[in-house]
Amino acid sequence: MKNNALRINPTDNVIIALQALKKGDVVILENKKSFEVMEDIPAGHKIALENIVAGEKVYRYGEPIVEATRAINRGEWVHVHNTRPVPGDITV
């Protein structure tokens, strides 16, 4: 089986689509079938690897990159419509 998603760090709660995925496509991660995507996801975009509650941080590269603004279910697209910058993440 050819992977269609990539987990960058073992602590990440999102994975990256290696190709455009359509709703219902099965994620193949680490050469195993994993779960279905819940909506169309563009190549290079994030997919929730697990359920993420509102206010929880989204981890990529093992670091918090954004915070969920609503519950995000496993298999959903993680993007600007359901996340915001991590409060206090940027100092000027």
Where in the sequence are the language-model features?
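N-terminal small-residue-enriched
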Residues: 2-92
